Amino acid sequence: MEFDLGAALEPTSQKPGVGAGHGGDPKLSPHKVQGRSEAGAGPGPKQGHHSSSDSSSSSSDSDTDVKSHAAGSKQHESIPGKAKKPKVKKKEKGKKEKGKKKEAPH
């Protein structure tokens, strides 16, 4: 398997030459595709499997994700609050000049 992965990595570099050779053999073609997927996504699934094996670690990750989401929500709430303050200042300026006219239709 390691040999296949190594061979799959090499064709990625020598795409024109080796790619044509592999393309000729239907059996090698799917193998190459699988090898490529494993090589490309190898780091991702490997880590995923590790997390899956460690249930406690996976749970901690989930908790961290939830906390991150909560923090993100709070930040989002703060941002609109800050955005409103400048708008209020603009409205105050508008109230002094044209604010009364704008408020009447409102």
UniProtKB/Swiss-Prot annotation:
Basic and acidic residues compositional bias, start-end: 64-79
Main location per the UniProt record: nucleus
Cellular component, GO, one term: nucleus
PTM annotation (Phosphoserine): residues: S29
Basic residues bias spans: 82-99
Key words of the record: Acetylation, Nucleus, Phosphoprotein
Subcellular location: Nucleus
InterPro entries documented for this protein: IMUP (IPR026621)
Residue numbers of N-acetylmethionine PTMs: M1
Sequence segments annotated as region (Disordered): 1-106
Pfam families membership: IMUP
Protein's UniProt name: Immortalization up-regulated protein
Gene name per UniProt: IMUP
